[in-house]
């Protein structure tokens, strides 16, 4: 997870409502599995923990061979990242892309159920690797095609909400000029191949960046009524407003039929101000699980696939909140109770 850009949303005074229901299993929810810790359980135990908690999808940030081996015959669907260290070589060398797919995907398919390949995480627009994302995506797609897997496994890239130059109101959502230079052709690639755009969505960072304009209930899905009225669209939570701003931005560059997959979203349980608490983290993530099945005001009834960030608190990340997004401690005990 990189630093998230805040989104400016006009604030309103809100009342806090109470979470009143425990969700049943939601198939559209996954959890991100990071490994930046020196005390984490082995991948085989992690996969068992996913299964015992009815977590049906996993985001894996690099093709860790022990994790892929543990995922065999687990029925867990996998979003697999191409790490930034591989992006440039895969962009410039189709043979390298073929080798990458053979080694990390074909070798495990179909006993590992790959869903997406994410070429890079939050590398657009500011990274020096941004120019290599689309060529790498094309080479990975061609490698999947050679293996006959282009219809089963979709190729995309993960961006953060900093790619939005305009986000309020949501219907005015538009990519910044810097991001659009890269994203316009990427969106055309996604549209032509039926692939979604992967977006990391963090109402937490929007709230902490604009506490005078954004209320905590709006960020936590606990607002008691409509907060933002945007023409015919009514918004009661910030998550929907952010996702719909991305949909609007996609429409502006010819991506009206491109889906959005929320490749990261979460709330820290400690390490920041008072808003970083176990109570707020539980409330946000449980409400996210409850919410995604109903779509957004701009896409009502269309389930939003989302991945909670993240499975464990990781002690080798930067201090503060970065170490405290986990649903579980490294000893596999829950940081707080949550139901999938």
UniProtKB/Swiss-Prot annotation:
One GO molecular function term of this record is: glucan endo-1,3-beta-D-glucosidase activity
UniProt record similarity statement: Belongs to the glycosyl hydrolase 17 family.
Where is the catalytic site? 122 (proton donor), 264 (nucleophile)
Q: Which reaction does it catalyse?
A: Hydrolysis of (1->3)-beta-D-glucosidic linkages in (1->3)-beta-D-glucans
Q: What is its EC number?
A: 3.2.1.39
Characterize the pH dependence: Optimum pH is 4.5.
Keywords of this entry = Allergen, Glycosidase, Hydrolase, Signal
Return the PANTHER family for the record: GLUCAN ENDO-1,3-BETA-GLUCOSIDASE BG1-RELATED-RELATED (PTHR32227)
Signal peptide residues are: 1-28
**Ubl conjugation among the record's keywords?**
no
Pfam family name, one: Glyco_hydro_17
Alphabetized Gene3D superfamilies for the sequence: Glycosidases
Q: What is this protein called?
A: Glucan endo-1,3-beta-glucosidase
To which species is this protein native?
A: Musa acuminata
């Amino acid at each position: 997870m990189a630093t998230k850009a805040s989104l400016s949303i006009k604030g309103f005074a809100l009342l806090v409502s109470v979470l009143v229901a425990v969700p049943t299993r939601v198939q559209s929810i996954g959890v991100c599995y990071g490994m930046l810790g020196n005390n984490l359980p082995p991948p085989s135990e992690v996969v068992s923990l996913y299964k015992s908690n009815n977590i049906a999808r996993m985001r894996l940030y690099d093709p860790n061979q022990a994790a892929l081996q543990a995922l065999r015959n687990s029925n867990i669907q996998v979003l697999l990242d191409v790490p930034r260290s591989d992006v440039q070589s895969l962009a410039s060398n189709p043979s390298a892309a073929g080798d990458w797919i053979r080694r990390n995907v074909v070798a495990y398919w179909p006993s590992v159920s790959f869903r997406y390949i994410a070429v890079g995480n939050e590398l657009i627009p500011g990274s020096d690797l941004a120019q290599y994302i689309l060529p790498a995506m094309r080479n990975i797609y061609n490698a999947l095609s050679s293996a006959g897997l282009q219809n089963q496994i979709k190729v995309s890239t993960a961006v953060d909400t900093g790619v939005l130059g305009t986000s309020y109101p949501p219907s005015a959502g538009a990519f910044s000029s810097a991001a659009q230079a890269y994203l316009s052709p990427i969106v055309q690639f996604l549209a032509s191949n039926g692939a979604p755009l992967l977006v990391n969505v963090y109402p937490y960072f929007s709230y902490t960046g604009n506490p005078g304009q954004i209320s905590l209930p709006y960020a936590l899905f606990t607002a008691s009524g409509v907060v933002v009225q945007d023409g015919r669209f009514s918004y009661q939570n910030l998550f929907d407003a952010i996702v719909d701003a991305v949909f609007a931005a996609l429409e502006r560059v010819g991506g009206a039929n491109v889906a959005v997959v929320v490749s990261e979203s979460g709330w820290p349980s400690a390490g920041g101000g008072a808003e970083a608490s176990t109570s707020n983290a539980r409330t946000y993530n449980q409400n996210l699980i409850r919410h995604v099945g109903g779509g957004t005001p701009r896409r009502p009834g269309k389930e939003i696939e989302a991945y909670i960030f993240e499975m464990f608190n990781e002690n080798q990340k930067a201090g503060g909140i970065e170490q405290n997004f986990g649903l579980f401690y490294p000893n596999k005990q829950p940081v707080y109770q949550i139901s999938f």
